[in-house]
Amino acid sequence: MEIKRIGIAGAGTMGYSMADIFASYGFDVTLWNHRKPTLERAKTLISETSRDKIHYTTNLEDIAHLDIVIENVTEDMAIKEGFYESFCKMADADMILATKYIRSFHQCPGPICDAQGTLFRDALVQSADAYSPY
């Protein structure tokens, strides 16, 4: 699978930074957040060269049919669980869904998302130099 369309769920520091970097490398990026003021703030913090290359949305459906979505939703478990409950019902079955971190992962009452695939926790990143703009 070739990754061309990337969704970022959550427009906080980690989310808008990822969107900025992916857009600077030419990917089609959609940045989603459940709160419009957070998206507006993210727009002001993303580099000018990337800002207009990113689609900003509060509509969850806009990221449900992309190649990969990276979840960066706030660590408020009620909000995070609400995101997964809604998103997993509409996401394409062959989409890659990744998460940066779930603080209380071990305390989750059950599966986060009924999906095919493998969850790699504590994955080792051998080298990110090829992807870093710095």
Where on the chain are the PLM-derived regions?
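Structured loop/turn residues at beta-strand edges in well-structured enzyme cores
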Residues: 1, 64, 117
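Short glycine/serine/threonine-rich phosphate/pyrophosphate-binding segments
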Residues: 16-17, 78-81, 104-106
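Rossmann-like NAD(P)-binding element
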Residues: 34-41, 48-97
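Rossmann-fold dinucleotide-binding core
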Residues: 98-134
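A structural alpha-helix within SAM-dependent methyltransferase catalytic domains
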Residues: 20-23, 64, 88, 110
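NAD(P)+-binding Rossmann beta1-loop-alpha1 motif at the extreme N-terminus of oxidoreductases
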Residues: 1-58
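Hydrophobic/aromatic residues located in beta-strands of well-ordered beta-sheets
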Residues: 29, 69, 97-98, 119
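A generic structural signal for alpha->beta connector loops
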Residues: 26, 51-53, 94, 116-119
